[in-house]
């Protein structure tokens, strides 16, 4: 790693910014490792989740039927947008009472977590290095990744949550017997010879939906964050070209990234609604 | 060791390049169809727009998952011996 003597090389800088602050102190070796907990992702997702719930609660508590303020205006806009989408997809009003607020929370939560990507790359990690060094640690090992949705374990965790919700609604709407019957007869019809194929198709469908749902958000945010890091490398060359390149390329990518952030949060919300809606219709 | 890194770099480039071909063609076709439809029926423009953005995200999904994995190969290289 970067010893005190010289500044980090380009790849050390990138790898340093890609390493999570986890309970093992170094990067995660193998792909699946249940013992590793990414403390920074947990911290940022929980804090931003609490902020989301607080914002929506404050808007709801201060809602007046009179002239709405800007804050209430934007929350109303969001609620109407999510309600319209939910009405179009989830047809049972009774389960919509739970699913629409869930979709709204998911949208605002993921949007705010994604928006952390717009902060300068070194802002929070450098503050954390100071705190870490003050606490007696070696600053070169003070890792921090600010964007929780650029962490595969976080996004797959969210999509697994959506999967569990779908299983719950499948059982609630169709009953365990109805759902198990559907599992074995769904795509190709009710013939004993087709049972294994039907069951395999259903399992593949559930797994594919969950993995693509989580990986899509991860892929977009990870690529976006990495491009911000690479642009920051441009600035670290401390040349006039490098500095202006960093400022121009960084602002262009940040402006485009605002669209990606909103779009990915919208897509995650829409797919949550679509998957729960699918759990209602029988095949 | 150099061979591994060389092939990893090639793999990352191929993943991103081929993924980009698919995503761009898909969005190009969808965009042209969307413009055609909104030209033919302007009142449907808004409804189609939200669906177009949703589909644009879905089309980009495979490409950006590939880009995510290719960049993971490039920087946090799991193939180092």
From Swiss-Prot, chain B:
Residue numbers marked as site, Reversibly protonated during proton transport: 60
Localization: Cell inner membrane
Lipid bilayer topology: Multi-pass membrane protein
SUPFAM superfamilies on file: F1F0 ATP synthase subunit C (SSF81333)
Main location: membrane
TM ranges: 7-27, 53-73
GO cellular component terms attached to this protein's record: plasma membrane; proton-transporting ATP synthase complex; proton-transporting two-sector ATPase complex, proton-transporting domain
Function: F(1)F(0) ATP synthase produces ATP from ADP in the presence of a proton or sodium gradient. F-type ATPases consist of two structural domains, F(1) containing the extramembraneous catalytic core and F(0) containing the membrane proton channel, linked together by a central stalk and a peripheral stalk. During catalysis, ATP synthesis in the catalytic domain of F(1) is coupled via a rotary mechanism of the central stalk subunits to proton translocation.
UniProt-listed NCBIfam families: ATP_synt_c, PRK06876.1
Family from the record: Belongs to the ATPase C chain family.
This protein's name: ATP synthase subunit c
């Amino acid at each position: 790693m970067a010893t005190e003597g010289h500044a980090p090389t380009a790849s050390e800088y990138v790898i340093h910014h890609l390493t999570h602050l986890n309970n093992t102190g170094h990067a995660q070796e193998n792909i699946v490792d249940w013992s590793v907990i990414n403390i920074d992702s947990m911290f940022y997702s929980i804090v931003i989740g609490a902020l989301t719930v607080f914002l929506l609660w404050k808007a709801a508590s201060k809602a007046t039927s009179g002239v709405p303020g800007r804050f209430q205006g934007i929350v109303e806009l969001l609620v109407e947008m999510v309600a319209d989408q939910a009405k179009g997809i989830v047809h049972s009003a009774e389960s919509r009472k739970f699913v629409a607020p869930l979709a709204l929370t998911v949208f605002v939560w993921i949007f705010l977590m994604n928006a952390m990507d717009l902060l300068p790359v070194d802002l929070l990690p450098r503050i954390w290095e100071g705190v870490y060094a003050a606490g007696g640690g070696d600053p070169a090992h003070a890792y921090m990744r600010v964007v929780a949705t650029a962490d595969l374990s976080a996004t797959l965790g969210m999509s697994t949550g959506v999967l569990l919700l779908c299983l719950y609604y499948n059982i609630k709407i169709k009953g365990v017997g109805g759902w198990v019957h559907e599992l074995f007869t769904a795509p190709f019809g009710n013939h004993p010879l087709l049972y294994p194929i039907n069951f395999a198709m259903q399992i593949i469908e559930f797994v594919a939906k969950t993995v693509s749902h989580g990986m899509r958000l991860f892929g977009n945010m990870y690529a976006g964050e990495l491009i911000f890091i690479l642009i920051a490398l441009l600035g670290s060359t401390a040349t006039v070209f490098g500095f202006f390149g960093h400022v121009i390329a960084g602002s262009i990518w940040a402006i485009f990234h605002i669209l990606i952030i909103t779009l990915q949060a919208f897509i995650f919300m829409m797919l949550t609604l679509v998957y729960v809606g699918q759990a209602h219709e029988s095949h | 060791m150099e061979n591994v890194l060389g092939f990893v770099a090639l793999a990352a480039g191929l993943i991103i390049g081929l993924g980009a071909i698919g995503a761009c063609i898909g969005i190009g076709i969808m965009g042209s169809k969307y413009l055609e439809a909104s030209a033919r029926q302007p009142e449907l423009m808004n409804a189609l727009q939200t669906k177009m953005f949703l589909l644009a995200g879905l089309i980009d999904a495979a490409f950006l998952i590939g880009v995510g994995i290719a960049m993971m190969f490039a920087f946090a290289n799991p193939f180092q011996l």
